[in-house]
Amino acid sequence: LYALLQKQSKEFHLKQYPVRIAMPVNLRRFFPSRTLRNFITMVYPSIDPRLGEYTFEEIITQVHHYMRYYINEKFLRGDITTNAATQRNPVIRIVPLFIKDIVVRTFYAKIQDKNSSAGLTNMGALKVPEEMKPYIERFDIYMGQPFSSRTNCAIISFEDVLTINFASSIVEADVERYFFRKLVQDGIHVKIESNRTDESAF
């Protein structure tokens, strides 16, 4: 959110827009399930710069309270109930699967993907058997390239290495640059690897 706000403030001086991140929530943490299918719902922490300038600390505070408010069993159960009711709809049930797939992909590309400024997924700390650790340097995880002009970010950690990967359909690397520069300013050691040909991107 900080990097998105920085990018927007530099590009649009007259009009500011809310920035919103799409984040999946693993529902297995709250509702144990043996399904191998994705069992997630989405939350959208956001900052509205039209209300005033936000410091980094204020962004952290707002996101913290948003997550505490929305990520709880009652809200999540409501999402599950809504989705289950849609699946049980008799009209939807008789629609062929290939048509459903087309509709879902179109909905995501035209609406869902554009409903947020960026996507973020955090796999957390990955654990492996002790005998495997000496052979592993790090893990990487990537989100697919978004349909719209936005940036996706995926985070995973192993031992003392935190890996943050970006995927974007935008030529410029402004969001990534603001993000990593903030980490460096805060005294965090950063090693950057990129497949971009412009070495000055960061």
What is the role of each PLM region?
Residues 6-202:
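Acyl-thioester-dependent acyl-group transfer interface
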